[in-house]
A protein has these predicted regions:
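Amphipathic beta-strand/beta-sheet edge segments enriched in Tyr/Trp
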Residues: 28-36, 186-233, 312, 333
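C-terminal soluble interaction/assembly domains
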Residues: 224-227, 255-336
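Bacterial N-terminal signal peptides that target proteins for export
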Residues: 1-11
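A short, hydrophobic beta-strand-centered structural micro-motif
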Residues: 76-87, 157-160, 174-209, 292, ...
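N-terminal segment of the mature soluble domain
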Residues: 49-66, 122-175, 275-299, 316-317
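Signal peptide-directed extracytoplasmic domains
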Residues: 65-126, 134-140
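N-terminal signal peptide c-region/cleavage motif recognized by signal peptidases
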Residues: 19-22
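Short, well-ordered alpha-helical segments
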Residues: 30-70, 178, 230-234, 270-282
Length: 336
């Protein structure tokens, strides 16, 4: 189902092209929250806590919990849930209903981030008495980071750490957060962001030094505290960076800009359905409108509430689009 595509604004003349071979990281369990009910916590309080976590995954850490629509939903959070079960270890496993959440967040006018997230590739070392060592994906600290990433809706992945990786990335490269080597080594993976992490200390007092590259932005910081808390704070920081760049702003009817999408290589119903599915996830209030079909090229009109930069990022996230020059059309021959 490979096809090339380009997008062109009705006024600005923007064009992009890509091959559909590297999809975005789709969080399959985005609408499921697991948490432990504390001894001093009632079941209703635990359900409200899970609902806040779910709302933050979709609408960011700064979601307005006092907005009337959200506050009312938090009074009876069970109405947003499709299933409540008990997992291993006594944890609550709560499955939320996407449509019910969507209605509440739409009423509150919150910016939203869907299940398609930019993948973040983690290069990490553990500091020990004998020096730094690469963090194995199955090490206890790595499993803690994976759990925290799932809890906060972050699409975290680990490199293979094979000979090709090790020829470019050493423990020192990760500790120094050397962007040239790390970004070069990350090119072989379908990730949008690169994270360098140095983890040290004990479970009771962990220190995490992190650096994130996401698109053209670069952030770094240090987090200290108990291991579980530090991992959660790190994932909240990463989630905030993802949300800032990829969240789709709310817009009233009539505030959407209109864009024209030129798609080449649509060679069947499957490719066309995939394209429409991607466009529907852009946060539009209207269905994409088919303008024309010529051979294997279709032209659709879409409305989008964000900026040109946000639209380009969202399309690139789903279809790995890259900006290109708009093709120059040959002039029509003058009649003789």
């Amino acid at each position: 189902m490979g096809f090339k595509q380009g997008i062109r604004a009705l006024l600005s003349g923007m064009a992009l092209v890509a091959a559909l071979h590297a999809p975005a990281a789709v969080l399959d369990n985005l609408y499921q929250v697991q948490l432990t009910q504390q001894e001093d916590q009632s079941r209703d309080q635990a359900l409200r806590e899970a609902t806040v976590v779910m709302l933050q995954r979709l609408a960011g850490q700064n979601v307005d919990l006092k907005h009337q629509a959200i506050a009312n939903a938090l009074k009876s959070p069970q109405e947003l849930m499709s299933r409540i079960a008990t997992a291993e270890g006594g944890q609550l496993r709560i499955q939320f209903e996407p449509d019910a959440l969507g209605r509440v967040l739409k009423q509150s006018g919150q910016p939203l981030l869907g299940p398609n997230r930019p993948g973040i590739l983690l290069w990490a070392v553990e500091a020990g008495e004998l020096g730094d060592r690469l963090l194995s994906p199955v090490a206890p600290r790595a499993l803690l980071l994976k759990q925290a990433a799932q809890h906060r809706g972050v699409a975290l992945s680990f490199p293979l750490a094979d000979l090709q990786d090790l020829s470019l990335v050493s423990e020192q490269v990760i500790r120094q957060a050397s962007s040239e080597e790390l970004l070069e080594a990350s090119k072989r993976y379908p990730a949008d962001g690169t994270l360098a992490l140095v983890a040290g200390g004990s479970d009771e007092n962990t220190e995490l030094q992190w650096t994130l590259w996401l698109n053209d932005q670069h952030q770094s910081g240090t987090i200290s505290g108990p291991a579980t808390q530090a991992a959660d704070e790190l994932m909240q920081a990463l989630a905030a960076q993802v949300f800032a760049q990829y969240a789709i702003p709310a817009a009233a009817t009539g505030e959407h800009a209109e864009w024209r999408l030129h798609v080449q290589g649509v060679d069947g119903v499957g490719a066309y359905s995939a394209l429409l599915g991607m466009l529907r996830r852009l946060g539009t209030q209207q269905q994409p409108r088919l303008l024309s079909i010529e051979g294997d090229e279709v032209v659709l009109q879409v409305s989008f509430p964000g900026s040109e930069e946000q639209l380009e990022r969202m399309l690139g996230l789903d279809m790995r689009l890259q900006r290109i020059e708009e093709p120059v059309r040959e002039p029509e021959p003058e009649p003789e």
